[in-house]
């Protein structure tokens, strides 16, 4: 096997290689990691499942160009430094969520409070996406919300936190469950 065709990520939880179809991150892990940017060489990855309370310090979530990815499930309280409503409300928003160019991605689920202190949410060129679920207080502090490259509309954007108008636009496109108060 050519070294250029086989790559891997090794950590205390195991190995993810270029032939993995599923990546399961156990609850409470990877809390010292400052970003999650999955490399394009994980070209066979079909499913990403992140357990509760993971990536507590991560300020970047980026998935770009994973051609086989079909499903992303992120459980509650992930990618958020603060863990309760009062702290999230008062925390500076400084994280970035980006998911782009995953032509087979159909399902994205984010659990309660995940990404609560992120400032940017972008979904680009995800033509197969039909289910988007955002749990309670997800992306609560997010002033930049962008959805582009979906059919039949080519560009849907909201530049403030989710509003009823954004929810109406999104419900035409996919099933969206939001519980922002």
PLM segments and residue spans:
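A short, polar/proline- and glycine-enriched secondary-structure boundary/capping micro-motif
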Residues: 83-84
């Amino acid at each position: 096997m050519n070294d250029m065709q086989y790559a891997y990520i090794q950590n205390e939880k195991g190995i993810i290689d270029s032939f993995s179809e599923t990546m399961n991150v156990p609850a409470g892990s990877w809390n010292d990691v400052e970003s999650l940017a999955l490399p394009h060489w994980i070209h066979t990855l079909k499913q990403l499942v992140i357990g509760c309370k993971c990536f507590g310090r991560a300020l970047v979530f980026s998935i770009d160009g994973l051609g086989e990815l079909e499903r992303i499930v992120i459980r509650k309280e992930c990618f958020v430094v603060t863990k309760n409503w009062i702290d999230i409300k008062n925390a500076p928003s400084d994280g970035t969520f980006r998911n782009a160019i995953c032509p087979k991605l159909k399902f994205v689920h984010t659990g309660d409070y995940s990404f609560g202190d992120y400032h940017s949410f972008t979904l680009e060129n995800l033509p197969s996406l039909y289910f988007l679920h955002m749990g309670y207080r997800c992306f609560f502090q997010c002033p930049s919300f962008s959805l582009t490259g979906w059919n039949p509309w080519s560009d849907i954007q909201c530049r403030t936190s989710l509003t009823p108008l954004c929810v109406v636009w999104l419900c035409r496109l996919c099933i969206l469950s939001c519980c922002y108060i």
